[in-house]
């Protein structure tokens, strides 16, 4: 069986540090996620073209805009590529696209001008260049949170579940049950004993070892602890920033604590 190459393509802070993963084989290329802005999408196009491979597949691993707003640029450059996502992700994208455009209106010309609607992934795997990428994750409390597992290369493409060097985005998981389920998914991910791990959000050039799993889990546990012993979001935020003074993506701790404390709605 031919070997695959994996490359993480980082995005700037202004794009919430959202990564994409470029997978290449002897002939073809696959992208996992499509960038937050149109500029992100154009950068992905440049990277794919530099490989000289044919882009056949774009898997959108989650329904938040930083996972797919750049898809328009990718589709324009590679009109024959298939865009795929799970059924919950497709539903989420369709239901929230217009409201997310309004929420991120300050991005102006970086916003997409049309929706690229992914096809629903048939089954629970993607076969690329003869290699199976298994869809893992999801839970009763987190039905739309998946990751990809490639057994032959022992690779985890962690998507929305993994952060590295950043505050973890918890605004979309406002309940303790959801965050506990998230930790369970991380435990299952670690049990696979991966040797290459891609975080969905990370500081540029972070390592591709188990650290993203460890960091995300430790942060979620600390988040729960500080929520339990602080009176309001401001105090919880201060406590988390004191624990993790070096982390980026501070908007995540600001919004996450407010949502968890019931001081604002998000979604």
Predicted regions and their residues:
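Short catalytic-loop micro-motif centered on adjacent basic/acidic residues
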Residues: 30-33, 57-61, 134-135
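Active-site HxH/HxHxD metal-binding segment of metal-dependent hydrolases
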Residues: 50-125
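Divalent metal-coordination and catalytic microenvironments
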Residues: 23, 33, 48, 62, ...
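Accessory terminal helices/loops
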Residues: 191-193, 203-267
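Short acidic-hydrophobic surface loop/beta-edge motif
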Residues: 23, 123-128
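Conserved beta-strand hairpin/beta-sheet module of binuclear metal-dependent hydrolase folds
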Residues: 2-50, 147-159
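Metallo-beta-lactamase
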Residues: 36-37, 139-140, 145-214
């Amino acid at each position: 069986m031919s070997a695959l190459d994996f490359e993480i393509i980082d995005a700037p802070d202004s794009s919430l540090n959202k990564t994409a993963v470029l997978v290449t084989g002897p002939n073809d290329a696959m992208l996992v996620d499509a960038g937050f802005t149109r500029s992100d999408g154009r950068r992905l196009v440049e990277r794919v073209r530099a490989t000289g491979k044919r882009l056949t597949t774009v898997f959108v691993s989650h329904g938040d805009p930083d996972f797919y707003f750049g898809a328009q640029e990718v589709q324009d450059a590679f009109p024959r590529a298939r865009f795929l996502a799970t059924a919950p992700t497709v539903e989420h994208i369709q239901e929230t696209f217009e409201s997310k455009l309004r929420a991120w209106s300050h991005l102006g010309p970086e916003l997409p001008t049309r929706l690229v609607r992914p096809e629903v992934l048939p089954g629970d795997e993607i076969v690329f260049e003869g290699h199976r990428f298994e869809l893992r994750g999801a839970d009763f409390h987190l039905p739309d949170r998946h990751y990809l597992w490639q057994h032959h290369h022992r690779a985890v493409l962690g998507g929305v579940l993994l952060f590295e060097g950043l505050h973890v985005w918890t605004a979309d998981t406002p309940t303790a049950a959801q965050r506990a389920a998230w930790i369970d998914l991380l435990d299952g991910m670690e049990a696979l004993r991966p040797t290459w791990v891609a975080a969905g959000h990370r500081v540029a050039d972070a390592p591709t070892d188990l650290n993203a799993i460890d960091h995300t889990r430790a942060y979620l546990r600390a988040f729960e602890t500080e929520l339990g012993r602080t009176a309001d979001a401001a105090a919880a935020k201060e406590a988390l920033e004191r624990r993790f003074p070096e982390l980026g993506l501070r908007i995540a701790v600001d919004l996450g604590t407010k949502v968890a404390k019931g001081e604002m709605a998000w979604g």
